[in-house]
Amino acid sequence: MNRSNWALDDWLNWQESLNQNQIDLSLDRVKEVKKKMGFIQPDIDIYLVAGTNGKGTTVHLLNSILCLKGLNVGTYTSPHLKKYNERVTYNNKPLEDTNFIDSFIEIENVRGDVPLTYFEYGTLAAFLSLNRFPCDAWIIEVGLGGRLDATNILNPNVSIITNIALDHQEWLGNTVNEIATEKAGIISSNAPCVCGALNTGEIIGEIANKKNTDFYLIGDDFSLSNGVNGSVWSSKSKTIEKIKIPNHWAQGEENNLATALMSIEACNADLLPNSESLNHLLDNFSIPGRFQVFDYRIPWILDVAHNPNAAINFRERLEAIKLHGKNIIIFSLMKDKNLEKFVSLFEDIIAKWVVCTMDTPRSLSGDEISKRLSEKGLFDVTVLNDPDEAFEYIETINHNYNAVIVTGSFEIVGPCIQWLENKK
């Protein structure tokens, strides 16, 4: 098969068709291909970020702070919202198609008959691509779990675990302790581990101790607390005072900030920001798809919350901005998510539900969501075929409502961002 003239989309479509297991946790395949490529990780600071929720926010905070200090920073996150290129950035700019294509060609030249999943291809390509840039630091987001995730072929300078909650039980275990054990698999011997997961700090700390690793736990070794003139971040040896926390943040974002700052101290304390530069950063800090607000006739509030823990945090942020009046929600979930728990967090502030089937085989159907909503006594529900139909429908009735909430998955928030941007 001649792939010399393939565009990026051709490569991605082909990768999806090769291995039908979208999730197939194992390090054997990526390690074998990594060895065949002769890949050697760069001698720079590498931050590896795992957790149930808050990984993306923590990565963005770390990236913003390190770039502010003048470092050249590469990041790898997943999934993307609009374009695949978002997954890999260098100094805040997504890489060009050619960067990925060159890396995919390099992988194919050595892969042989070793099967790779879509995510494994992307991870190897991300590392190859970033290695071509003069990076001072990499910030890498774990995809799923940790121990067997493709990103775990790296040996990080600091391992970060943001929080632990129930999600992806089919692959990671049915209890928070089982999930914590999987995520703690990223802890590297003799490299510090920073943990923002207070509920499983003991078990993660035990694993860190067995690996002869310095362990920093939120609440014990570092914290973000209220002070006289703002918030105060403190560790055993450093303090940053007068921090102005954004008024729409919830506890999750505050914990992510505390964890990011401790991670920087654990890696290189000289890179910690002062309060003035940190406040300037926070005043301008935003992440696509995380409490992202568009003003299109009425406010559209978008959040990729896709499990109960994330939904609780999203609800807290809505309360922080004192959301009131009649609100409408565009909503869909994957089949493995706890729909009833998710819905219970929003039903008292939602006057109308608009549901649809997302463009992925893992999506619940709109009809199934509607059926389960009616079983909970929620009957003002409109079912539409796909996200775009839902957005167009909302456009015709939004004058009756105070705000539009869009949530449940990257697969509905991403298309909504694209749709709203096209309306500008």
Predicted regions and their residues:
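A conserved segment at the C-terminal end of the G1
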Residues: 49, 57-74
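Extended acidic/charged loop-beta regions that coordinate divalent cations
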Residues: 122-171, 202-243
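Nucleotide phosphate-binding/pyrophosphate-handling subdomain across enzymes
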Residues: 133-142, 149-160, 164-168, 175-178, ...
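C-terminal helical cap/extension that packs against the catalytic core
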Residues: 194, 198-203, 210-215, 299-300, ...
